[in-house]
Amino acid sequence: SDGALSYRNGDCGYQNKTAIFPNYDSVGEHIASLERFIQEGTIESHKELYSQIRLKAKDNGNLLESLQKDGICYLEYRSIDINPFDRAGISLNDLYFMQLFNLYLLFKEESDYTLWQEEALENQKAIATHGQKELQLKKDGNLVLKEDWGMEMLQEMRKLNDTLGLDKQDVIEIMEKRLKDYQLTYAYQLVEVVKREGYVAACLNLAKQYKDEAYKARFIFKGYEDMELSTQMLLKEAVKRGI
């Protein structure tokens, strides 16, 4: 697709054949909605809910029971593609942004628009398929430009960052630049590398680079780089042995 950002988050991705929209008003109502989908045969178990964000519990082997008993333990984000330009698969700045974005959502007033999940799915597929281009998204039944809506949220996140003293303004600036210039997106950069080197060669070159970097740093203990190398090795082994 011309201008695609993420094939996996578009029609080519792993998803439910029929769109499923659980209830998120409360943990209890969320559980009840999943149980209803299972009883109706829409899905066979909670594991077959392939939404972009899933509520996870203390005991995910018995998810629904544990959610009811223990509440939400953490959120599983399933829409984040692997970043091939970072050897960890995701950059630290992107993680900081996700952290800030979660805080922003906690403070953001909810809309009472009832079709928000349907709109979100349409927006997701539009961004995934044509996200490098300027396009219109749906927001509470109205059309809004992608960049306008994105900048609005980033400005609100900037205010939250300043209010809470989080010192993440650099992260927000990175996202603002990426929103304004599609050539800064990972998708565009990957396509350009593949054009120059070929798909297989590009991936192998990155893999070899990360292997070499890991090998050169095999004795380094992160966070203690200012110590003697022998001390770092000793501390590293101690941690491995649980000391």
Language model: regions and residue ranges:
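Extracellular structured ligand-interaction cores
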Residues: 72-74
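Loop-rich catalytic cores of soluble enzymes, especially ATP-dependent carboxylate-amine ligases
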Residues: 1-69, 116, 135-139
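Extended, compositionally biased non-globular segments
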Residues: 36-68, 81-99, 103, 121, ...
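Sequence termini and other peripheral, non-core segments
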Residues: 116, 127-243
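Flexible helix-coil linker/hinge segments at domain or subdomain boundaries
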Residues: 102-133
